[in-house]
A protein has these predicted regions:
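Extracellular/periplasm-exposed beta-strand and loop segments of Gram-negative cell-envelope proteins
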Residues: 391-402, 430-459, 485-514, 538-550, ...
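Outer membrane beta-barrel translocator domains of Type V secretion systems
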Residues: 294-472, 586-587, 592, 597, ...
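Outer membrane beta-barrel transmembrane domains
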Residues: 409, 502-608
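Extracellular beta-strand/loop-rich repeat segments of large surface/secreted proteins
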Residues: 40, 46-53, 59-61, 65-78, ...
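Outer-membrane translocation/initiation segment of Type V secreted surface proteins
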Residues: 169, 175-188, 202-364, 368-370, ...
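Residue-level detector of the transmembrane beta-barrel scaffold of outer-membrane proteins
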Residues: 20, 57, 80, 342-346, ...
Length: 608
């Protein structure tokens, strides 16, 4: 057991407490601690959870006001809140509560945007401030519910009815329906006795059994009937008393490639008794022309969130390939005039990101490359290299990817007596990305994802020219580089856990990047230190993706990676001996949609 009395504080860190926790006007803080096998008693005290679980519930006495705070992703209260005292429950920073408001005292539940409450309110003196998610598990009644874009999830088969004495704000209300009969919406009704002016309820159900893209009258009517059935789950009892403060929106959630279908906010109607309904005119097929049905159904974004998440995964693959094409300084360091044949190796890593045109990705990676070259009598170094790049990518809505790249390269480099150099490299590579792409919904009934694997080959050639101009112990090297590369097309299936799948056909993508740069530094017999500034421009980078589901019209998404950005690098070369050199640099980009958040490169070269 643990207890805190008379304003005292007890901190439980990295332990397990068996039995009750008691706070009589004191504070109990837990961190990495589990409290099990007993209800906690708060008589005017405070229980604050950090990365721990309290099970067994919370009790309060009649003359007290107590607080329970779960303010970490690992903080969880499991059990009911009961008793006659006042209770404030706060869920924030990923904190969660699995239990019910079951007492008789005034209870205030605050669910922040990243908090989750799974349970019910059996106490009519409960007020709810909903910014996150409430997943209802049985019949519930609350005195007041104020929502700031929060979600009431009633997709559980036993969610029951919801009685709200007074409602204010904007809330998403989610229901499930029979997948074989989409017009049968499951779960109990939601009853709102009164509402603040301008309040809105957005009612959503999934798209199973519905085709929102279809132009057929029967399919259109099924969508309308499903929306009407969804509307019927809302009962605005204040309406029959003349109140007109509540508005609603009805929506069929998007699918893999099917866009969402919704109605304008003001078109949700209420019957005389306050029950919601959709006033619509049945559609007819084109061979039987009629006036357009009103209200017109609004279609959501052409590109669904799963489509955009999948495109983000493919975009990350393209950028991984593009990022791996690099200049001579990164690959071999600063070759001296007359450098001999050599063997070199380097490791490099960093993070690249992209957030534009409804595509988002971040890829943290590490890579290694080894190469060998021979100096010819003409002064040219010709050689080859093998490389491996292993990444870990994240996408919007919790998506993730595992991009991998294997490359073979052949290069020719010449450094002249007057400081001029030419570097030409041709590269081929095998690129793969096993990814998971999620949709935008957080409610379990609407949450969906696909898994796929993008597998293709890349080709590229780069030509770089520069001239080192020496100025005493310093030097300046203007540079120009042109890089062309191509990723081949690929076609693959992306499957969802529900059994749905979509075909993804990615076009080939060409890239043409120009770079103008300048290197300035100081040097000695042992090496040099330099700063490099470069300006890049992507002249091409256009492509498209065709998404298709069985029995549905395919959708085409086009994209362009045209962009301009700058990079700044700091680096140096150091000769360990006349036949060995180490080199390293740090790079960061500025401007543009494509960003090199950071990159570190280090290598070693041996001459023989």
């Amino acid at each position: 057991d643990a207890s805190a009395n008379a304003g005292g504080t007890v901190k439980l860190i990295g332990s397990s407490v068996g039995g009750a926790v008691t706070a009589d006007n004191g504070t109990i803080e837990t961190e990495n601690t589990n409290v099990v096998n007993g209800a906690s008693v708060l008589n005017g005290g405070k229980l604050k959870l950090k990365n721990g679980t309290v099970s067994g519930g919370i009790k309060t006495d009649a003359a007290s006001t107590s607080d329970v705070v779960m303010d970490r992703a690992g903080a969880s209260l499991q059990g009911d809140v009961s008793g006659e005292g006042k209770m404030d429950v706060t869920l924030s920073n990923g904190g969660s509560w699995k239990g019910s408001s079951a007492g008789s005292g005034e209870t205030k539940v605050k669910v922040e945007s990243d908090g989750t409450w799974t349970g019910a309110s059996m106490n009519s003196s409960t007020d709810v401030d909903l910014r996150g998610k409430w997943q209802q598990t049985s019949n519930s009644k609350v005195r007041k519910l104020v929502s700031t874009k929060g979600t009431l999830d009633k997709t559980d088969s036993v969610s029951g009815t919801t009685d709200i004495g007074h409602f204010g704000g904007e809330m998403s209300l989610i229901y499930a329906h029979d997948k074989t009969n989409p017009t049968k919406v499951l779960g109990g009704g939601t009853f709102i006795a009164a509402a603040d002016a301008g309040s809105t309820v957005n009612m959503i159900t999934d798209n199973a059994g519905l085709d929102t893209n279809s132009k057929k009258a029967a399919d259109k009517n099924k969508v309308s009937e499903a929306l009407n059935a969804l509307a019927g789950k809302l009962q605005y009892t204040g309406y029959k008393n003349g109140e007109r403060n509540l508005k609603g929106k009805l929506q069929i959630a998007e699918g893999l490639t099917s866009s969402s279908a919704g109605l304008r906010t003001e078109t949700l109607s209420f019957k005389g008794d306050g029950q919601g309904y959709l006033d619509y005119m049945p559609a007819k097929d084109p061979e039987k022309p009629d006036k357009p049905s009103k209200p017109e159904i609004e279609t959501g974004d052409y590109e669904t969130s799963i489509m955009s998440s999948t495109r983000s995964a493919l975009t990350s693959s393209i950028l991984v390939w593009r990022n791996d094409m690099n200049d001579m300084y990164k690959r071999m360091g600063d070759l001296r005039i007359g450098a001999e044949s050599g063997l070199w190796a380097r490791v490099y890593g960093g993070r690249i990101s992209y957030d534009a045109h409804n595509a988002y990705m971040k890829d943290s990676y590490w890579a290694a490359q080894v190469g060998m070259d021979k100096r010819l009598a003409s002064g040219w170094h010709v050689g080859g290299a093998f490389g491996y790049n292993d990444g870990s990518a994240t996408y919007r809505y919790g998506g993730k990817g595992d991009p991998k790249l294997y490359t073979l390269a052949a290069y020719a480099t010449r450094v002249s007596e007057d400081g001029q150099y030419v570097d030409i490299i041709a590269k081929v590579g095998k690129l793969s990305n096993k990814f998971t792409a999620y949709n935008k919904y957080s409610a379990p009934a609407l949450r969906n994802y696909v898994e796929g694997k993008y597998d293709t080959y890349g080709y590229g050639i780069s030509a770089e020219y520069g001239k080192k101009i020496r100025m005493g112990k310093g030097f300046v090297t203007p540079q120009a580089e042109l890089t062309w590369s191509r990723l081949s097309s690929d076609s693959f299936a992306a499957a969802a856990p529900s059994g749905e799948s979509m075909r993804v056909n990615q076009s080939s993508v060409n890239s043409l990047i120009g770079r103008l740069g300048v290197v300035a530094g100081v040097e000695s017999d042992k090496g040099n230190f330099y700063a490099k500034a470069s300006l890049f421009h992507e002249f091409d980078g256009d492509g498209h993706i065709l998404f298709s589901e069985p029995g549905k019209t395919g959708k085409r998404s086009s994209f362009s990676l045209k962009d301009t950005w700058a990079e700044i690098a700091l680096g140096g070369n150091y000769y360990l001996s006349p036949r060995s050199m180490i080199y390293a640099d740090f790079t960061k980009s500025f401007g543009g949609d494509y960003k090199v958040d950071w990159r570190i490169n280090a290598g070693i070269r041996f001459s023989f």
